[in-house]
Regions:
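Soluble non-transmembrane domains of integral membrane proteins
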Residues: 1-182
Length: 182
């Protein structure tokens, strides 16, 4: 447990660590607090802005997708996608790229009561679950190249709540695709 070379940290089951980052923009300070627990795949994120000019929109984005797990890339890609639950509906988007320039055709931008958003592949999921419903989710996808003829989608999710943008709390789960763990 603890820091190693100030680049990595390891946690035992009963340990947790809180990482606090801040950014000052004009007269506003944005503070992001992230809590990691050694006994959970869930990471807690709290973003708050304080100051005279609280008009900045807050976003939490996952833009690096999930790495492939199968040697047979097509098998892995066929299970991958990006989804969101908004206004009690679930929208799932996916694509199978044939070139490096391919992108998700119908990038999804949804507003309303956003309950969760997720990126998945065959075995793993990264789910973002706000502690209270947020107002905007953007689902997108680009392409990563493996060999001259093999391409894989890279999905991204962005959550925001412009109406109550002074504070936003979101839990992320990144682990096995097992509904009992989420």
């Amino acid at each position: 447990s603890g820091w190693i070379d100030k680049e990595e940290f390891f946690l035992e089951n009963n340990e947790s660590v809180e990482l606090v980052c801040s950014l000052v923009v004009g007269n506003t300070e944005i503070v992001k607090t992230t809590l990691f627990s050694g006994s959970s795949f869930v990471v807690n994120h709290h973003i708050a802005q304080q100051g005279e000019d609280n008009g900045l929109d807050l976003y939490l984005m996952w833009d690096s997708g999930i790495n492939n797990t199968e040697k047979n890339l097509y098998d892995d890609v066929s299970y991958s996608g990006v989804s969101a639950s908004y206004n009690q509906e679930i929208e799932t988007l996916s694509f199978i790229p044939g070139s490096l320039n391919d992108r998700l055709e119908n990038r999804g931008s949804y507003s309303g009561a956003i309950d969760w958003a997720a990126i998945r592949n065959k075995y793993f999921i990264m789910a973002m679950v706000p502690e209270s419903s947020v107002g905007l989710v953007v689902l997108d996808g680009s392409t990563k190249q493996f060999t001259n003829k093999e391409f894989s989608p890279v999905y991204s999710v962005t959550l925001s709540d412009a109406e109550t943008s002074q504070n936003m709390s979101i839990n992320t789960y990144f682990g096995p695709l097992d509904i009992d763990n989420i």
